[in-house]
């Protein structure tokens, strides 16, 4: 039986046909919204976070059926298997134990191993932060450069930026990911090799982009006067392949381990987060883990009807598989969370952008939606026009931090007001009759342009304050949401075979770009023409 033939899926399809034309404006009308109100019935909390799902195109019956689908699809079974360390990544024969990295129960899988490596990280981070760790000329470290890509970059970069207000002012952290030399070169202009520590992060330590940047940075250190014998003072590695790290030239004692039972996009809780720990300190890193662990416990223990990751995930299923939404927007009204949308792009689309079910049969229903976003209020002046008046319905997750992490507190009411007002405007809209009044009797032709359809669905997540703990809970919420949706779609969220083919062909094309001659029949006519054009340019 395929997922979309489950009884609850069929019930949801019937239910969708029944309510698809209903307008939330009518549901919120006082005469239709007696106590307990929608705002009360669709308010949930967990892991220190609060959620308002009331401005979604759902009823009590919708949530009941969505939870029923989650049960029928085996969400609980898959969740429990993941926490237990079972092989939930069958295509690679691996567990997915990112939750073990923040577990506090000594009975958790790999507990002693995780604690030992974290203690090594903490000792090293303290040395760097205190100034005890010195470069080859005896100066303290003032710059940390994290070189990695994908999960080795997006998570740490997002967290370091989000917790900037908690970071030591003595150290500036830079992130380099792109193989475009401009990325590394721009950072080189801002650092002093005598005061720089490079953290090279790669699960295999063979990743093209990471190793290209790592070699260039190592060469730059030597060119600037660092003896090769002193590079150990400036380079550390994080990898599941320690032998390859040592082969690169990093001292064995400077290698921090990650494990193959942790996927890259779930790895910021491990030594991949060393740049985070150096920036904010071991104590705050521990708070980050504690917040994630709190959400883990909520995900494990809360009934599905009140389970934040389950509800967030199933509401996403509702729009993707029944309304046919192609994308969804993440709009954090927090500049500190600037990089959260790009982090979630990888988490959601690399995890669930799949077409093959666990049994190898192709799905006949949509899976991951396009994830995108920008912090508020910037997005309001870029793409909110489309959200309000375009023909496409895009579900939105608003994220609001209720208290500021900076001293410019007078800005904050304006920020929150915009967030809440956008959710209200998207829900209510503006009718043609209302638009005519706004246009005025002298410009009736303007009225159609002032109509807002409304009925645009939004969820609002509330964070009391942006702390390491609350950030950890927020990240874990989305991690578990991904698992919930993968369970419903019957796909594997822990592999990423889709990135492999381009890598393989990329090596062939790279060789052709620099070879003395090229067999034009090796590639299609378009690719051959692109290679020829590039070869001519590179020879100039």
Swiss-Prot record:
Catalytic activity, as annotated: alpha-D-glucose 6-phosphate = beta-D-fructose 6-phosphate
EC number: 5.3.1.9
CDD domains per record: SIS_PGI_1, SIS_PGI_2
InterPro entries: G6P_Isomerase (IPR001672), G6P_Isomerase_C (IPR023096), Phosphoglucose_isomerase_CS (IPR018189), SIS_dom_sf (IPR046348), SIS_PGI_1 (IPR035476), SIS_PGI_2 (IPR035482)
Molecular-function annotations in GO: carbohydrate derivative binding; glucose-6-phosphate isomerase activity; monosaccharide binding
GO biological process: gluconeogenesis; glucose 6-phosphate metabolic process; glycolytic process
Main location: cytoplasm
Annotated active site: 350 (proton donor), 381, 503
A single cellular component GO annotation: cytosol
SUPFAM superfamilies in UniProt: SIS domain (SSF53697)
Annotated pathway: Carbohydrate biosynthesis; gluconeogenesis; Carbohydrate degradation; glycolysis; D-glyceraldehyde 3-phosphate and glycerone phosphate from D-glucose: step 2/4
UniProt entry keywords in alphabetical sequence: Cytoplasm, Gluconeogenesis, Glycolysis, Isomerase
Family in the record: Belongs to the GPI family.
Role description: Catalyzes the reversible isomerization of glucose-6-phosphate to fructose-6-phosphate.
Record protein name field: Glucose-6-phosphate isomerase
Gene name tied to this protein: pgi
């Amino acid at each position: 039986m395929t997922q979309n033939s489950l009884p609850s899926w069929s019930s949801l399809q019937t239910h969708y046909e029944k309510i698809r034309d209903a307008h939330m404006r009518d549901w919120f009308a006082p005469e239709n919204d007696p106590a307990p109100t929608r705002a009360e019935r669709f308010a949930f909390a967990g892991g220190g976070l609060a959620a308002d799902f009331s401005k979604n195109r759902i009823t009590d019956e919708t949530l009941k059926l969505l939870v029923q689908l989650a049960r029928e699809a085996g969400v609980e079974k898959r969740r429990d298997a993941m926490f237990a360390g079972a092989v939930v990544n069958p295509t690679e024969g691996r567990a997915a134990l990112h939750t073990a990295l923040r577990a506090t129960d000594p009975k958790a899988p790999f507990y002693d191993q995780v604690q030992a490596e974290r203690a090594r990280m903490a000792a090293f981070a303290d040395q760097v932060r205190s100034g005890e760790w010195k470069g080859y000329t005896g100066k303290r470290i003032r710059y940390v450069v994290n070189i990695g890509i994908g999960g080795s970059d997006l998570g740490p970069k997002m967290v370091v930026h989000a917790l900037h207000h908690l970071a030591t002012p003595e150290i500036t952290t830079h992130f380099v990911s792109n193989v475009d030399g401009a990325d590394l070169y721009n950072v080189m202009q801002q650092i002093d090799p005598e005061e720089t520590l490079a953290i090279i992060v790669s699960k295999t330590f063979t990743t093209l982009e990471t190793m290209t940047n790592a070699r260039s940075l190592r060469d730059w250190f030597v060119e600037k006067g660092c003896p090769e014998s002193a590079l150990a003072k400036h380079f550390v590695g994080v990898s599941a392949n320690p032998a390859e790290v040592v082969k690169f030239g990093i001292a064995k004692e400077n290698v921090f381990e990650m494990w193959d039972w942790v996927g890259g996009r779930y790895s910021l809780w491990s030594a991949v987060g060393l740049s985070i720990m150096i920036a904010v300190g071991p104590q705050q890193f521990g708070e980050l883990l504690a917040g994630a662990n709190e959400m883990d416990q909520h995900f494990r223990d809360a009934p599905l009807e009140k389970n934040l990751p389950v509800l967030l995930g199933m509401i996403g299923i509702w729009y993707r598989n029944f309304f046919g939404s192609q994308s969804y927007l993440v709009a954090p009204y927090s500049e500190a969370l600037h990089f959260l949308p790009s982090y979630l792009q990888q988490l959601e689309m690399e995890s669930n952008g799949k077409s093959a079910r666990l049994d190898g049969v192709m799905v006949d229903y949509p899976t991951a939606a396009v994830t995108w976003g920008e912090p508020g209020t910037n997005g309001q002046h870029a793409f909110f026009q489309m959200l309000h008046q375009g023909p496409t319905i895009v579900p939105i997750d608003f994220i609001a931090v209720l208290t500021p992490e900076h001293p410019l507190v007078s800005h904050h009411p304006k920020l929150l007001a915009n967030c809440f007002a956008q959710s209200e405007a998207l829900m209510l809209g503006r009718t043609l009759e209302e638009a005519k009044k706004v246009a005025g009797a002298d410009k009736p032709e303007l009225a159609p342009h002032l109509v807002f359809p409304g009925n645009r669905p939004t969820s609002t997540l509330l964070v009391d304050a942006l702390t390491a703990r609350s950030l950890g809970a927020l990240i874990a919420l989305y991690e578990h949401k991904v698992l919930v949706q993968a369970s419903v779609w019957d796909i594997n969220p822990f592999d990423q075979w889709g990135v492999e083919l381009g890598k393989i062909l990329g090596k062939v094309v790279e060789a052709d770009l620099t070879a003395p001659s090229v067999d034009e029949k090796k590639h299609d006519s378009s690719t051959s023409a692109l290679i020829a054009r590039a070869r001519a340019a590179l020879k100039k």
